[in-house]
């Protein structure tokens, strides 16, 4: 693919995926406003969030397939208008059904673009600057998640939320305009012999996503005492096991489970999942604590939320500078230890803590999470033979998003149930519930450190960037081979990626 400049591709990547990430976290922050405006209950107001997450996870594996068939430019120019339509539906919605439809369109468009843009982004950087891709992945993608939280806080403060989705739609419209001029057609596989579509895998994935969504809806409505909830989760578990078995055995799977069954991809998946859940739990508890317990003003809460961007910037810069020097394992250890410290401080926070203390904890939370996400993301991507990189990473992203799909609902459900079990005043009950959330986040942080130590024990793995003359100093280049039938010793022997091999590997799905 021809590009004008790698920073243009970076901009296109952020405009393709960022608005969807912003929309998800912003909508979670303005649930109270949505309930007042649309006239819905707490139960139904979270359904659009769940449906959007479901569509996001479900459509991730479709991105590489659509790119292979049609090319990146047509898919880009088709997906972003779908996202714009979804944003307009939400912004103009008068009932929860339209909001759910809008979130489905947003999630589907973002899911399709995720695994199209990540390989394109990494491929666009020259070999000696490839570590800059982490600057965009963490600063742009993870930063979009944080910006969504900040915008949601601002919307809550001013009492209006619809303008958020006009902004998200406008960002996607800018992406369409930029892609029209700078994203060119590429060679794709339409003329080649097409491999048979994995219909069984696609159907099982759809059924799995639907069963998961229904189960979480039942949980929100009836709680764990209902038999329907347990039946739903039982069906979901059976479908998940069936999907893993089918995708492991099929020749051309929709989700390449077999290719990610290596130490680094598995550990990377667990690290990303634990890291994203940790920050979701911590932010939810801390913002609720500040609003309800400390009676902090909305202006101060917005300023505190803005400090999260400082942590994102720190994480992006450190990830880009340190990944090739220390490897994903050590990067994850550093981030995990920061999160352990932050959650330990929140467990023992004093009633008279200053705003400066809160700001420092916010910065450290964002920085620690960013480092762990970088470690898990790149550790999983680079943790196996290169020809299977995109397929392996697609499987990791699908499973990560599937695990995260119901987290917002679980956080809300746990907080309300935990507070209801407590005796005493409402304020004391909520304080105990938030304290329990901090404890859960602390346990997850400790788990992150342990997983990162395991990642570090597997070795540094591939480097992202190196000088062109470095490849002459390395061992003779091995032929690009698939992970199937590859010994562990051979997999670990890859250290520096030859530029030609790297680019051919990332283009593997387009041929």
From Swiss-Prot:
GO terms for molecular function: transmembrane transporter activity. Its main location: membrane. The keyword Transport applies. The keyword Membrane applies. The chain crosses the membrane at residues 7-27, 46-66, 80-100, 107-127, 134-154, 163-183, 200-220, 226-246, 266-286, 301-321, 329-349, 357-377, 394-414, 437-457. Belongs to the major facilitator superfamily. This is Uncharacterized MFS-type transporter YubD. It comes from Bacillus subtilis (strain 168).
């Amino acid at each position: 693919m021809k590009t004008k400049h790698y920073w243009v591709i970076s901009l296109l990547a952020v405009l393709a995926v960022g608005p969807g990430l912003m929309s998800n976290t912003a909508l979670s922050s303005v649930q109270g406003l949505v309930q007042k405006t649309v006239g819905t209950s707490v139960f139904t107001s979270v359904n659009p969030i769940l449906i959007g997450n479901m569509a996001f996870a479900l459509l991730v594996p479709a991105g590489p397939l659509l790119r292979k068939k049609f090319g990146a430019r047509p898919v880009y120019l088709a997906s972003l208008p779908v996202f714009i339509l979804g944003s307009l539906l939400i912004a103009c919605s008068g009932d929860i059904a339209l909001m759910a439809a809008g979130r489905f369109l947003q999630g589907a468009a973002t899911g399709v673009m995720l695994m199209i843009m990540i390989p394109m982004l990494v491929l666009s950087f020259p070999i000696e600057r490839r570590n800059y891709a982490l600057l965009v992945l963490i600063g742009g993608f993870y930063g979009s998640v944080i910006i969504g939280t900040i915008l949601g806080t601002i919307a809550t403060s001013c009492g209006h939320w619809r303008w958020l989705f006009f902004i998200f739609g406008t960002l996607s419209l800018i992406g369409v305009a930029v892609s029209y001029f700078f994203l060119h057609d590429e060679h794709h596989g339409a003329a080649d012999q097409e491999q048979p579509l994995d219909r069984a895998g696609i159907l099982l994935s759809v059924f799995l996503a639907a069963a998961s969504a229904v189960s979480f809806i039942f949980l929100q409505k009836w709680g764990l005492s209902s038999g329907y909830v347990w039946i739903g989760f039982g069906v979901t578990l059976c479908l998940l096991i069936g999907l893993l078995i089918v995708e492991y055995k099929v020749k051309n799977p929709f989700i390449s489970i077999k290719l990610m069954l290596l130490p680094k991809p598995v550990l990377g998946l667990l690290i990303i999942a634990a890291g994203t859940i940790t920050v979701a739990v911590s932010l939810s508890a801390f913002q609720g604590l500040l609003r309800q317990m400390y009676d902090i003003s909305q202006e101060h809460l917005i300023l505190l939320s803005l400090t999260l961007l400082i942590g994102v910037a720190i994480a992006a810069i450190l990830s880009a500078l340190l990944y090739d020097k220390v490897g994903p394992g050590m990067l994850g250890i550093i981030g995990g230890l920061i999160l352990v410290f932050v959650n330990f401080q929140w467990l023992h926070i004093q009633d008279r803590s200053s705003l400066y203390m809160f700001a420092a904890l916010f910065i450290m939370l964002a920085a620690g999470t960013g480092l762990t996400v970088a470690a898990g993301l790149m550790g999983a991507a680079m943790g196996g033979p290169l020809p299977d990189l995109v397929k392996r990473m697609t499987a990791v992203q699908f499973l990560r998003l599937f695990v995260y799909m119901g987290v917002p609902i679980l956080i809300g459900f746990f907080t309300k149930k935990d507070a209801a079990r407590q005796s005493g005043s409402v304020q004391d009950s909520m304080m105990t519930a938030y304290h329990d959330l901090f404890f859960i986040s602390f346990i997850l942080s400790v788990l992150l450190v342990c997983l990162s130590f395991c990642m570090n024990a597997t070795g540094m793995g591939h480097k992202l960037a190196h000088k062109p003359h470095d490849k002459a100093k390395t061992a003779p280049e091995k032929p690009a081979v698939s992970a199937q039938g590859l010994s562990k010793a051979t997999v670990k022997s890859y250290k520096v990626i030859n530029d030609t091999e790297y680019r051919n590997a990332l283009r593997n799905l387009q041929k």
